[in-house]
């Protein structure tokens, strides 16, 4: 899944010669927290809500323009970046959004934490009418296929699977999200097969 599928394409932007107050007004008007700074269609900087909070603690803000407070070399991604990779960039850099640019730094869009969350919710099927069963598979390297087959053989349809990040394999929990079904029956089937069902949500 690519960034281009989830980014905001109609991006509100500003030029570096504008005042801080103009920037604040734009952010309030459009309810945004990240404002790309452009020059001739190319990205030259980024202003965030956090940057502005710090500036308002200083005096003489009326003498400042965007170029005085913007991030001059913001981290960016391309539209072909995988959504998972964009999520990693945001997580590791502790930032709230990424401008999306082409090879010539032309601004194409912006992708934020909210956009990425929406993508993962779609991938996981969280908002759909689903059931979930959480299972510890143990050490058997073929356990995932065996459990998946047991679920399918009993009429279950797997929507997505998540895995806990436990470093010890036998303690990892597998979160099977299924199309709405009799998950209690499936839990009993898996337990009879020797697997530990941690929880189930109908």
Write out the residue ranges for each language-model feature.
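Short phosphate-binding/catalytic loops that engage adenosine nucleotides
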Residues: 32, 156, 195
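Conserved short beta-strand edge segments in small beta-sheet-based binding/regulatory domains
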Residues: 159-161, 191-202
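Tandem CBS (Bateman) regulatory domains
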Residues: 1-10, 48-78, 82-94, 103, ...
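Core beta-strand residues in small-molecule sensory/regulatory alpha/beta domains
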Residues: 38, 101-102
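Basic, Lys/Arg-rich alpha-helical nucleic-acid-recognition elements, primarily the DNA-binding modules
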Residues: 1-13, 17-40, 45-50, 56-57
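Short basic, glycine-rich beta-strand/loop surfaces that mediate nucleic-acid
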Residues: 171-180
